[in-house]
Amino acid sequence: MKPKPLLSRVKSENLPEDIRAAWDKSMSLRGDGTFFEVFAKHPELYRWYIEEFYGKVFQLGKVKNRYKQLLRLKLSTLHGCKFCNQGNRNDALESGLSQEQIENFENQNLDVFSKADLAVMDLAERLSMSNPNGTLDASLYSRLREHFCDAEIIELGFVGSILTGVAKFLFAFDLVEKEEYCPFK
């Protein structure tokens, strides 16, 4: 079901150029641009999210982008964000994840995923909204530490937490379409 937010929207023909470009891409991919129509009410915040969070932390940062794409897709899959999944799958494929890996998120076939991949996906499960008691315990820390330094583990945790918080915002404000299985109706 398409989102029906209470917040007002900016008509597509009145969107700022950068938000209009993102809206066009979303309409082509998803057939919905609600997120961009609403966020156009606060273009400075939208630009911070895209330029500062995505541009500097998510895309650059210390951790290889492939692992952040894996983390993001695992979170959006757990949360049931259809809007997110539609874009995140494409980005994950472009970052080097295989279609087979994406299709095996649930059973986490050890032949398909590396130990680093499995540790990142376990971290995503700890950070997800559906796991309010999730923590970085000694076992997971040890598994992550085999592949990442502390600065990289902090970055993965921070990125995952920001994405989880944004997902909560998107659902609470009804800005995106949800998967049928989404537990957050």
What are the language-model segments listed below?
Residues M1-V63, L93:
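Mobile cap/lid helix-loop segments that border enzyme active or cofactor-binding sites
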Residues A116-F158:
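Acidic/histidine-rich alpha-helical segments that form the ligand environment
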Residues D150-K185:
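Preference for long, well-ordered alpha-helical segments
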Residues L45-I50, G80-C84, S130-D137:
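Short acidic alpha-helix initiation/capping motifs at coil-to-helix transition points
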Residues F105-K115:
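Acidic/His metal-coordination segments adjacent to aromatic residues that form catalytic metal sites
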Residues N85-E103:
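Iron-sulfur (Fe-S) cluster-binding segments and ferredoxin-like electron-carrier domains
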Residues F39, Y49, F53, L70-L75, ...:
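Short alpha-helical scaffolding segments that buttress acidic/His motifs in well-ordered protein cores
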Residues K68-L71, L75-R89:
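Short, thiol/selenol-centered motifs that function as redox-active sites or metal-ligating centers
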